[in-house]
Amino acid sequence: MYAFKKKYFLIIESIKDLDLRNIKIHNKFNVIYRNFNKSENIDGIKKFRNQCKLKQIKFFIANDTKLAVAVKADGLYISAFDKNLKSLHYIKSNFSIIGSAHNMKEIKLKILQGCNYILLSKLFKVDYDDKAPHLGIIKFNIFCNKTSKNLVALGGIKIEKLNYLKDVNCNSIAILSELKKKPA
């Protein structure tokens, strides 16, 4: 039996990575667009953002406040390496702020940055880096108990690991690499 969560965060690196027609449930999904590939034009991103709005999918831009404002995104995603506190003034507007962290020190920084949700990484071992440390379910749950913020499980979440998510003490999960796989 799979564990159902209140929110799902889908992290994409290109607007071509996700076909929104496959999302049937409204108000549960959030798309985080990591604009590493600067070749996508702003009009294409605006069109994708409008498609998200029609499907009631929240759309976030990673690490680029100017682009987030330009495309009228629902909010901003702040990576773990961004230690800047400038994002605080966006709290008063209708922007939501999502952050990313790997340890308790970074979680505290994301709270100072005004994050509504904090993606805590890596929950499970990841394929792309065998030696990278991962938290595991027990340590992740300890972090959840130490903070009042909404922590989101990220990292190593694959189809075969979905059953383990019922033991994770959080309401949301984030998926990156599973989105890139081609359907069978």
Predicted features along the sequence, with ranges:
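Hydrophobic faces of well-ordered beta-strands that scaffold small-molecule active sites
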Residues: 6-12, 29-33, 59-61, 76-78, ...
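Structural motif
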Residues: 26, 71, 113, 146, ...
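Conserved, mostly hydrophobic/aromatic
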Residues: 31, 68, 110, 118, ...
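Alpha-helix-loop-beta-strand connector modules within alpha/beta enzyme cores
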Residues: 44-60, 83, 87-103, 133-156
